Amino acid sequence: MKFEAVVRTELGKGASRRLRHAGKFPAVIYGGEAAAVAIELVHADVINQMDKPEFYETITLVIDGAEVKVKPQDVQRHAFKPKVEHMDFIRI
């Protein structure tokens, strides 16, 4: 499973809200030797794949042309809407 991701330049509550209104959501990749990276993902691409068991195994994120293998660590969902608010990924 492969998703396109973009490194976030704006961080914080307001920037995250703007992402969500634009049909995207914030995420972070951490673990391993490299530093943590804040990214943004397209909500429709991810939410359609979340009900598949393969989603919770290994995922490949393409960030600026580089492929990073990750595993979902935590998912924060909206309280009553079927939306993802934020995700944490751990490097493999």
UniProtKB/Swiss-Prot annotation:
Highest taxon of source: Bacteria
Gene Ontology molecular function: 5S rRNA binding; structural constituent of ribosome
Primary gene name: rplY
Role description: This is one of the proteins that binds to the 5S RNA in the ribosome where it forms part of the central protuberance.
The keyword Ribosomal protein is annotated on this UniProt entry: yes
Family under the similarity heading: Belongs to the bacterial ribosomal protein bL25 family.
Cellular component terms (Gene Ontology): cytosolic large ribosomal subunit
Subunit: Part of the 50S ribosomal subunit; part of the 5S rRNA/L5/L18/L25 subcomplex. Contacts the 5S rRNA. Binds to the 5S rRNA independently of L5 and L18.
Protein name: Large ribosomal subunit protein bL25
GO BP terms, alphabetized: translation
Gene3D superfamilies named in the record: Ribosomal Protein L25, Chain P
SUPFAM superfamilies in UniProt: Ribosomal protein L25-like (SSF50715)
Pfam family, one: Ribosomal_L25p
InterPro entries: Rbsml_bL25/Gln-tRNA_synth_N, Ribosomal_bL25/Gln-tRNA_synth, Ribosomal_bL25_short, Ribosomal_L25_dom, Ribosomal_uL5_bac-type
NCBIfam families, alphabetized: PRK05943.1 (NF004612)
